[in-house]
Amino acid sequence: MSIQNEMPGYNDVDQLLNQQGVGLTPAEMHGLISGLLCGGNTDSSWLPMVHDLTNEGLAFGHELAQALRNMHSAISDSLDDDGFLFQLYLPEGDAVSVFDRADALAGWVNHFLLGLGVSQPKLDKVKDETGEAIDDLRNIAQLGYDEDEDQEELEMSLEEIIEYVRVAALLCHDTFSRQQPTAPEVRKPTLH
């Protein structure tokens, strides 16, 4: 299955967010929407939740709303494709430093956890592998670096962390989005 809904361009979303006065980066918005989806929110309530969390409950203008609908659809499609196509939405290019990418990753993770927490209010009760991954994400959200660090080494470490975050998000999606099996009927033995 290929992604039918294409992700809007990072710089385009950045411009639309700035025009609307929304204090989030495209990476943070993608993290928030991804968190809502990975937390099991599959209905149309996601956009009003995003309004509440990012814009004091006010609806976005048409262009930004459409870009976010496209983003939501693209994320949903990539998650539904067994997650193979799901990627974090971070700034790229020669003009983007490794430090900018590290900051964007921390913002993505923070907002992913926000979206996940809104969808799954008892997030702190999650155990096993998913609970450990969520704890790791909380630590990654506080990601720090020393600007004197070797940038090539930091870039390699960052790529490993990005892949770990991607897999952790997929694990959350698998945990919270799968259908809970219904309990089989318990039959009481008939007394004769």
UniProtKB/Swiss-Prot annotation:
Pfam families: UPF0149. It comes from the Bacteria. SUPFAM superfamilies: YgfB-like. GO terms for cellular component: cytosol. Belongs to the UPF0149 family. This is UPF0149 protein KPK_0755. The lineage of its organism: Bacteria, Pseudomonadati, Pseudomonadota, Gammaproteobacteria, Enterobacterales.
